[in-house]
Amino acid sequence: MTAPFFQTSGNLLADRRYTFGQELAERGDAAGAADLFAQAVELAPAFVSAWFALGETRARLDEKSVAIDAFRKVLALDPADRHGAGLHLMRLQAKGLGGMPPDYVRSLFDQYAARFDTALVEGLAYRGPELLRVSVEAACAAAGRRASFRMALDLGCGTGLGGAAIRPLAGRLIGVDLSPKMVEQAKAKKLYDRLVVENLVTFLKLQSDAVFDLVFAADVFAYFADLAPLAVACARVLEPGGLLAFSVETHAGDGVILGEKLRFAHARTHVRAAIAAAGLRLLTLDDAVTRNDGNMPVPGLIAVAARD
């Protein structure tokens, strides 16, 4: 159990108890870990990382009310929510579903950037960009057009895994991501004509109408609860005939759920409704497994939609 963001307490004894608690948690001793985290926050009451870890372990022990109190303490001490405590409150049904804190997403991916490709491709058998590209090519073939794009946007480009998949299809390729360290990794691959570090919704709002003929988002929409506002923002920057292609995780029920891994899963009906709200025409909505988790396939969907 490792928090995506760690900030020392400034108290050596508290930091040591936190470290020992992490070791116990990783060995599966949640009760022992919780005791150490409780000692850490007693020594350093403003120790945000220890409060967060305490919330995680109490949740694992099914001590819901204590976990909720710990996560609320995290938010009080760090309103930017770099640890993602608000997401845990959503999971514990102590807070309604909403957007992910940008500072949490940034710190999470800054932490993983250097090992991201290996962890995702080798560890989780990630193949989202390739499957998404195949769907784009198939949609173009069905429409009797070439899979060739004047100006493509890789939304949430990360380290450039998506860029590698669509670079052969794009005259110009723009990448945008919230994480500076992920963008550094993408820059080293020399796939993009331009890379931008920015909040994705903010970036879309700053663009003129109808500037892209492809918006490509592999493994990005899993970080948004309601897809409709994002789909609307993407539709505005698409030129007539342009395509929006994205992948999501899905589930058999209705609406949106927040999974154990703190990623949103969207029902097929929610995806259809979001595309309709954006005024786009759905071309493809196929079942797909873009990644594994614990050697088990994660159910997903691949969507391709067009602006008429």
Region spans (language model):
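Helix-start (N-cap) detector for alpha-helical repeat units in TPR-like alpha-solenoids
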Residues: 14-15, 48-49, 82-83
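A short acidic, Gly/Pro-enriched loop at the edge of an enzyme's catalytic core
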Residues: 205-215
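A short glycine-rich, Lys/Arg-flanked "PGG" loop and its adjoining helix->strand segment in the class I
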Residues: 228-240
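Class I SAM-dependent methyltransferase SAM/SAH-binding core
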Residues: 151-153, 158-204
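Conserved beta-strand signature within the Rossmann-like core of class I S-adenosyl-L-methionine
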Residues: 241-249
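A short SAM/SAH-binding and catalytic strip from SAM-dependent methyltransferases
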Residues: 213-227
